[in-house]
Structure formats: structure tokens, C-alpha cells
Regions:
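Ribosome-associated RNA-binding proteins
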Residues: 1-180
Length: 180
């Protein structure tokens, strides 16, 4: 069974984008490629910080995160080469659509004073990156087991080559952009 948002994409979003932008070929219509969820961890925190972040990321995504390591020494940040500095998960396929559905429908509205995300955070190539203040906005995380609040960066990678196409795709998929 396909994800709910994938069927919405094929049944509603594709015809709307094709009509609006006059695409000649179905393969020109933008679509999601992947969603990357990244948690940066302060290397000088107590011992269990990386394990806690990896456990939280596993609960959110259902995938085991990859540990990101530093490439070189940076004395100002008290950072050594090959020291763990974060963890990330790349979601594709049905898992990507399920995570996007939970993000848009339940997690983002739980942010305090949420009025939508800025439509200016596109990178010029049709990808959208935004930060989430802490992991407790997701209902999968149990508040009693949280030792520290940990934010994360979420990147939505699309096949759209332009920001305008990616904005239209995300808007039609229910993404909560702030009004200008």
C-alpha cells in the first residue's frame, strides 16, 4: 500500500502542476527525491549526548542514523579529527512520504506561536531546508525520557531546478508557508 501523500501527489499535485506550468513531458514535473534529517551535537557535551540524539532520530524516522564525524582539528571549537559531531538520516520512498505527512500534519503545528515557515529558505536549486527548535514537537518522542532539548535541520530535496517550481510543489503537498 502506498503512502497517503504519494497518492495525493499522483492524483492531485501532478495534474495541477502540469496545467499551471504547461509541461510537455511527465518527467519534467517536480517530485520529492529525499528528506534528510540532521542533528548537530555539541562535541563538548556529556558522554551520552550522541547516543541520546541517535535514539531520538531512530524513534522519529524508523531508520538507524549515520554518525557524522569531523574532518579536521579545530582548536576554537575544542574539536578533534574524527570526533562525532552529529547524526543524520536520509529518507526515500514510502518512509519519506510518511515522515513528511507526520511533519506537516502533527509536528509543525505543535511549535509554539507557529505561523508558517519562511518561503525564502530555498537554495536556488529547488531544495528547501529549515530548522526545528527541538525534538519534542514530534509525538513519537516521550517527554519523560528527554534529557536535553535537541534541534534538527530538515532538508527536502526535489527534482525542481527552480525555487518557484519547488514552492508550488510543496504548497500543493500541504506545506505550511508563512504569508508574505
Amino acid at each position: 500500500m502506498k503512502a497517503r501523500l504519494y497518492t495525493k501527489y499522483t492524483d492531485e499535485v501532478v495534474p495541477a502542476l502540469k496545467a499551471k506550468h504547461n509541461f510537455a513531458n511527465v518527467h519534467q514535473i517536480p517530485k520529492f527525491v529525499k528528506i534528510v534529517v540532521n542533528m548537530g551535537i555539541n562535541a563538548s557535551l556529556e558522554k551520552g549526548a550522541m547516543e541520546d540524539a541517535a535514539k531520538d532520530l531512530t524513534q522519529l524516522t524508523g531508520r538507524k542514523p549515520v554518525i557524522s564525524r569531523s574532518k579536521k582539528d579545530v582548536a576554537n571549537f575544542k574539536l578533534r579529527k574524527n570526533q562525532a559531531i552529529g547524526c543524520r538520516v536520509t529518507l526515500r520512498g514510502d518512509a519519506m512520504y510518511e515522515f513528511y505527512d507526520r511533519l506537516v500534519a502533527t509536528a509543525l503545528p505543535r511549535i509554539r506561536d507557529f505561523r508558517g515557515l519562511s518561503p525564502r529558505k530555498f537554495d536556488g536549486r529547488g531544495n528547501y531546508t529549515f530548522g526545528v527548535p527541538d525534538q519534542t514537537i514530534f509525538p513519537e518522542i516521550e517527554l519523560e525520557k528527554i534529557k536535553r532539548q535537541q534541534g534538527m535541520d530538515i532538508t527536502i530535496v526535489t527534482t525542481a531546478g527552480k525555487n518557484e517550481l519547488a514552492h508550488d510543489l510543496l504548497k500543493l503537498m500541504g506545506f505550511p508557508f508563512a504569508e508574505k
